[in-house]
Amino acid sequence: MKDGKMTALAISSTALGFVLLATHATGVGVALDKVRAAAFGHAPQDQQQQVMLEQTFPVGAGGTLVIDVRDADVRVTTAAGGQSSVTVLAEARDQDWARQVFERMRFEVGVSGTTLTVRAHDPDIRSEEWREHRGVSMTVRVAIPNRFDVRITTADGDVEVGDIEGAVQLRTSDGDVQLGNVTGSASVTTSDGDVTAGDITGGVEFRTSDGDVHVGVVSGPAIVLQSSDGDIDAGTLAAEKITVRTQDGDIVLASVAGELDAAVGDGDVTVRFAKAAPASITAGDGDIAVSADGAFGFDLDLSGGDVSVPRGMVVQGTVSSRGARGTVNGGGPLIRVRSGDGSVVVNLPGAR
């Protein structure tokens, strides 16, 4: 048996060598495809996609979409119209195996009133089955009118939702989430993945345990952006209460209008205020930079490894290389900044 393994290895190595020698003649892309084929026994084009389910329903604007699938990617598109449709696609090398997996998932698709529901169960595939047949990728595609509420839950898969007017709730245990522009509230939770969204009106709660958070212009009564391990960057944030936290990553907030509570364990923080509002900004080990769009009045309480304010910025109080406390432009909401081992730079334009 050992000799057989060595012979197979020699054949694979020889095939791999011929593929690499062919690189100059056939191009890098073709050679890489052949390398994959030699290493794994199939080429990328062996993957085939087939439609497993396709249905259309008379559910127009103002409805609700509920999706609960165990192991599949979810893609939701929106457009003007009075109908909704559901398509389930399977991508695999073995089409018979793909059909078996689909049947094991026991998809349930139906309408009750104005609620369109898509549910699927865990296919319960054993490890030896995966080794024999290789993987199967399931995708649930749903098309709905622009004005719709959306609730999606998946245990393992990416989630994409286009522009929509309505409340959005997205949950995935393992996958990235992409969300378009939303007129309504948006709540997103993923245990392992990035969260990316456009402009949102209605409030936001985005949480990821391991991934970055990227948002555009967001407004509403409250905004929460949180990551345990990842960067957070946002365009304009406008709310009564804004909470931004990450344990390991940078925070960049281009424009803030509202009470801010920002904290990072290990990373830098950059904040620009669009109006005067209370703020607490903390970095365990990182630099903090604070600026403002105008000559707003603030109370300052700054502390860090190296604290600095620009020349000409008048602070009524005390300023040293380790901290500053006082008022700017007659005083106003308190900006409290703390960095355990990093620089703190505050630059308030017009505060001269």
Pin down the residues of each PLM region.
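Intrinsically disordered, low-complexity terminal regions
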Residues: 1-352
